[in-house]
Structures are given as structure tokens and as C-alpha cells.
Amino acid sequence: RGQEDAEAFGRSTDCFSRNGELAASCTESLSRLTDEDAYGLQNLIFDTPAKVRYFAWVYPLTLLAVATLLAAPFYPLSLLLFMAIFAVNLYIHYSNKLNVSLYGSAVKQLSLALRTARELAVEEVPGTEEATGQIRQVAEVERRSRVVGTQGDSANELAAIAWLFIELAKVAFNIEVILFQRFIGSITARRDAIHGMFRFIGETDAAISVARLRSETQTCRPQFVDGKYLKAEQVVHPLIDGCVPNTLVLDGTGLLLTGSNMSGKTT
């Protein structure tokens, strides 16, 4: 699909070349992904999903915790069993805390990327029709990701107290572990959609960059033909001034250009 992709990319570039306001609006949306942390998004696409430790015990322990609390008014000694279950759940909770925190940055970037993709889709940039379904699927993943990386606000005492009780509830009933397992499952199921949205944003960014480059320098566009044939007339490097123009014709043959570093191969 190399030729088809190149032609589609050319049409996208033309769209932004003709509409400077659209390019400026999209550039503003894309600017929220300029931080280096944005690279963390690719971890959700290409890395092997983390495995929740001791997950086979999570649901039975959660049911036991609920049962012992319900029985406590009638059998107070059941609170001792609840404390034992709480200790086990505490170990499971913090055994998985590292995995949860490792996904924190990637999840933040997923939310930013989803917001950016939605804004690009509203502008109806090239590729929007295909990306719409992918954006909808990623939104489902993003909703399940909100538990990941949630931390207390130590700067606010009231918020810290509230967070402490929330954290205790998460531990007692394995809430964070269960939600994290569902989040990992949604990533695995929607990985292609995340990748598609990632490409949609990247291709839009690249098309805007190429459109800007074409407006600032002298460039040309290839015309594809069948067969092994290449003809280039008066070719110069687009980013280096003072290059000697070269004409090249290859018909059914190849060309190997050699030379040491900084010897002028690109010019």
C-alpha cells in the first residue's frame, strides 16, 4: 500500500496547504502533546500488558470481606476474620501498586491524546471518518483508566483524610486491583483502536509539518508509474542552500551511492 498511502498523505498535505486557519487550529490542539511524556502513550500500544498478581484470590477474598462485615453485627468475632482478610488484601494491593503507578504517565497521555483526537475530528481533518470509531473505542478505555495512578492530595489536609478512607476501602475490597485488571483487559482488547488513534494524530501532525515545509522551500511531488523506472530532473537538497542540481534516470536498474561521512552524498 506504499503508493496508496503516499497519495493519501499528499491529499492531506494539500488540505492543510489550502487552509491555513485549519492548520493553525490543529497545531494548537497538537501542542498539548509536545511534552516528552507523550512518548509514554506508545507503551499502551507496543508493551506487553502488566499482569495483576494474585488475581485468582481477589474475588474470593473480596466476597469474604463483604460477608464478614455483614455478619459483624450478629457475630462480632467475625471482625477478627475481617482484619485477617484485610491484611492479605493489603499485601495484594501494594504488590500491584508498582504496576498501577507505572501506567500513570501513559494513562495521562492517553487522556490528552483522546482530547486532541476529538478536537481534530471536530475539525474534520483528513482521516476523521476512519478515526471516529477508533476514538469511540479509546474513550471506553479512558473511562476505565481513571483509577490508575490516583493519589492523595497531601497539600490539602481534608482531601488527604478523605483519600485515606478511600484508600482503605480500596484495600479492604480490592477495588483498585479489580479496576486495574479491567483496565488491562480493555487495553488488550482495544489496542488496535489506540494504535489507530495514535496514527491519526501522528499523520495529521506530519501533514501539517510537510505543508509548512512546502510553503517555505522549493519542493516537488513524485508521479508514480508502473515498473522499475525513476527519473529526477535538477534535484537539490531542500534544506541545504547552494547545492548543485543533479538529474538522474534509472530504467530497470538500481544505483548504489557510496562515500565517507560528510562527503556530499545527500547533496
Label for each model-derived stretch:
Residues R1-S263, T267:
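Alpha-helical coupling/stalk and coiled-coil linker elements that connect catalytic or binding modules
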